[in-house]
Amino acid sequence: MRSKQYNLVNLTMNLFKSLLFFIVLLVLSRLIPHPPNFTPLIAGAVFLPFMLKDRTLIIVGLPILCLFISDLIIGFHSLMLWTYGAFLIIGLTVFNISKLNLRTLLGLSLASPTIFYVISNFGVWLTAATYTKDLNGLLECYVLALPFYGNSLVSTVLFSLVFFLTRHLVITRSKSKFI
């Protein structure tokens, strides 16, 4: 009985350390110099819900918490509602998927930056005086945001694969210790 309790505590501590590592990584990724929209944040929103066997909705909020912590440091902005809303929709979408495999991961890694691009740039168009409030202005906003979208796509696919492969290696390594 005692070894089962120890294993549960050890597992809980390892999970806590992993989640803390992800939070620090995601926050730091916004604080260090990087190309625009080239961070692991969307990949974190895609991957984090799969870290827990018995998932809860709290895991959906972790990327938003990371955004909030980094916004405390770098400053709040007028598009926070659109940004946080996009991450909430991404998180809820991912949360409803039960099994992670490479095909699912790649699909989510392409869909999630697209969700972010559509929502956040709609917010830019709606709130910025730069664009006319008609279809031409909306299209102009989306076209001018394409380089940022490209960075989001590449970084999300790249970081999602890194997270997925790291998870696979850790699971394989931990299983081999007990066999």
Predicted feature locations:
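Hydrophobic alpha-helical transmembrane segments
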Residues: 16-21, 57-61, 81-85, 106-110, ...
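Membrane-embedded alpha-helical hairpins and interfacial helices in multi-pass inner-membrane proteins
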Residues: 102-179
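N-terminal amphipathic/basic-hydrophobic helices that include classical n-h-c signal peptides
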Residues: 1-12
